[in-house]
């Protein structure tokens, strides 16, 4: 048998999926940041910067999509707990060939917000894709990943 820290918490002793019982855990401040990149052609980046795409303000709509997605994570990911989310931000850096996305989520609760940050980042990237796909079929979404998480029993973690 593996030590407790190595056991999968979302399966019971028979290997069936279960939602983890967090009822006895202490509430703590928790945060998570995820990042991702949406690669596209230079012409598409320029049109995005100048807000010349027919679907409108791509980054504004994508930001709202990311915030909404963070709030809906437990509806999308079956074993995620519904959480009271205290803060969500979605920020962008526009580079020559891609848009960098950074999504941060915060709560005061019994479980972390890593999935909420990853879901926010993913939905943001998908929205950018959706709003730009008519002019650029080569768009790719890459490197969606957790960058850092703070709080909780396992403490802080930072990607190096």
Residue ranges and their predicted role:
Residues 2-59, 64-79, 86-160:
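C-terminal binding/interaction regions
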């Amino acid at each position: 048998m593996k030590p407790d820290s190595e056991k999968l918490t979302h399966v019971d002793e028979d290997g069936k999926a279960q939602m983890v019982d967090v009822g006895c855990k202490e509430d703590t401040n928790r945060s998570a940041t995820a990042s991702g990149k949406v690669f596209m052609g230079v012409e598409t980046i320029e049109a995005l910067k100048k807000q010349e795409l027919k679907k409108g303000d791509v980054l504004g709509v994508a930001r709202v999509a990311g915030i909404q997605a963070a709030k809906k994570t437990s509806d999308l990911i079956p074993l995620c707990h519904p959480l009271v989310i205290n803060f969500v931000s979605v920020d962008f850096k526009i580079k020559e060939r891609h848009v960098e996305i950074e999504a941060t989520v915060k709560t005061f609760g019994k479980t972390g917000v890593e999935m909420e940050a990853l879901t926010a980042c993913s939905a943001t990237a998908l929205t950018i894709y959706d709003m730009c796909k008519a002019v650029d079929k080569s768009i790719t979404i890459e490197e969606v990943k957790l960058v850092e998480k703070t709080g909780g029993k396992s403490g802080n973690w930072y990607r190096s």
